[in-house]
């Protein structure tokens, strides 16, 4: 199985060979719960997201990725931040691609659908905000969710 390995400020990390604009989406339901997926490629919990395709806006990509990975339809409602730390690289073992992080974190409200796992997610669930800290996730996802929970959408993170 193909894996994703995240490296943070690691001198032994492979050098990045690509930069792919991507989106992540904090989707919230009427109860205030956050939509989370368990990633198939590293078994960590994360918000849905993925690469922006050519000819697609970031909002369109966010809605598409959320639907593909979770079965949930959503409407984009805000921006939390832009994450582009060159010290964070992601190795994809299937093809040797090493990406420098470049992700835009958006907020959204759920508008329909049922949580449904996909080939990219082994589990999909609504998580109460107060339970997020107990979920296993990589450092950059924890940082992003921390910014969301702190209410950064009024003052986006740029880093």
Residue spans of the language-model regions?
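Active-site-adjacent beta-strand/loop module that shapes the phosphate/pyrophosphate-binding cleft
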Residues: 85-114
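Nudix hydrolase/Nudix homology domain
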Residues: 43-44, 114-159
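A short coil-to-beta-strand element that immediately follows conserved catalytic motifs
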Residues: 73-83
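Acidic, metal-coordinating catalytic segment for phosphate/diphosphate chemistry
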Residues: 1-24, 96
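Short, well-ordered beta-strand micro-motif
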Residues: 27, 105-109, 128
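Short connector loops at helix/strand junctions that flank enzyme active sites
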Residues: 20, 40-42, 47, 74, ...
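Conserved Nudix-box catalytic region and its N-terminal flanking loop in Nudix hydrolases
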Residues: 29-72
